[in-house]
A protein has these predicted regions:
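Short, well-ordered loop/turn sites that connect or cap secondary structure elements
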Residues: 2-4
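Short beta-strand-centered aromatic/proline hotspots
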Residues: 16-26
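SH3/SH3-like beta-barrel fold
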Residues: 22, 30-40, 45
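Intrinsically disordered, low-complexity, charged/polar segments
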Residues: 38-94
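Short, acidic/turn-prone active-site loops that include or flank metal/cofactor-
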Residues: 137-140, 227-236
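Proline-aspartate-enriched helix->loop->beta-strand connector
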Residues: 150-163, 221
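Catalytic cores of nucleophile-dependent amide-cleaving enzymes
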Residues: 186-232
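Charge-patterned, long linear interaction tracts outside catalytic cores
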Residues: 204-219, 277-297
Length: 297
């Protein structure tokens, strides 16, 4: 078979460690634009360095990642149940009774430079019970378009992500111009923070694979990638912000508590201590619950 757009390939020079999807082949230079199949990585490579992955090898790599994804989901659900038990105890004053209470988690605006990743993320938000509005746009359009979306959606949390990469030939790790899309993420965060300055009023996650972590945090992001300029998984932003959305506003979330259930951990992700967003209320009548569709315990 011939390598073409949408082919799933790997790079021989990197021991075929990551699956990529072919975006475009430049016929004149024989350079191929690539995006990670599961990682938020943007790259290019000579056509001669690429190999079509056999179905068996693709499934092997996908299954390895799926085990990590399933583990992260299990750990997150365990944490969520513990948080839920704590909230129920606090809401009822430690007494057992038949009253039902409702929960209002933080609302997410998830802006993604990759439409396929966006769909995967939206499915995970739904499984975790986090309200979300998802928007697909190119990373370059984000600085201009995202601030306008805030007025329409009025989110508690903003996710700014897509693809990125550190390009050694363009400069050192401290040089923002040596990154494919970090400058767009940084500009977006700065624009948003001119509207909403307080870190607990709007929680921001920004970045993708190998992004310029320090610049994103300095611009005003609560959480960002990538401290060690490593790759992050497509679903990592979801786990980070969902932890904030489902933690009581009475509690502060420590960075390690957020990172331990992600697929990338502290090498790929970091941030600052942030207040939770979830609020509980009671009572709620069963017929009203059905009518208003309030999320209940």
């Amino acid at each position: 078979m011939k390598i073409q757009a949408d082919s799933i390939v790997a790079r021989k020079s990197y021991n075929c460690d990551i699956l990529f999807r072919v975006v475009h082949i430049h016929e004149d230079s024989q350079i191929v634009d690539l995006i990670g199949e599961e990682m938020r990585l943007s790259a290019d490579a000579p056509l001669s360095d690429l190999v079509l992955m056999p179905e068996e090898e693709k499934n092997k790599l996908r299954n390895q990642l799926k085990k990590k994804v399933d583990r992260s989901f299990r750990l997150f659900r365990q944490d969520f149940k513990l948080l839920q038990q704590k909230r129920e105890y606090v809401s009822t004053g430690g007494y057992k009774h038949d009253e039902r209470y409702f929960e209002l988690p933080g609302k997410v605006l998830h802006v993604d430079g990759d439409n396929r990743y966006l769909e995967k993320c939206l499915q995970l938000y739904e499984k975790l019970g986090v309200p979300v509005v998802g928007v697909h746009m190119s990373e370059a359009d984000m600085p201009q378009r995202v601030p306008k979306l805030l007025d329409q959606v009025r989110p508690d949390v903003l996710v700014i992500t897509g693809h990125d990469a550190f390009l050694k030939m363009k400069g050192g790790k401290k040089d923002l111009q040596a990154y494919r899309h970090s400058k767009h993420f940084v500009r977006t965060v700065k624009e948003v923070r001119t509207k909403i300055r307080h870190l607990d009023q709007l929680v921001i996650f920004a970045g993708a694979c190998q992004s310029h972590f320090e610049s994103l945090i300095k611009a005003g992001a609560n959480f960002a990638s990538s401290p060690e300029r490593v790759n992050i998984h497509a679903l990592d932003p979801v786990y980070i912000v969902s932890k904030i959305c489902l933690t009581s506003f009475m509690d502060r979330v420590h960075v390690m508590d957020v990172l331990r259930n992600t697929l990338s951990n502290e090498g790929g992700l970091g941030g600052v201590e942030t207040r939770g967003l979830l609020r509980t209320g009671m009572p709620i009548e069963k017929d009203l619950e059905k009518q208003e569709d309030l999320p209940s315990n």
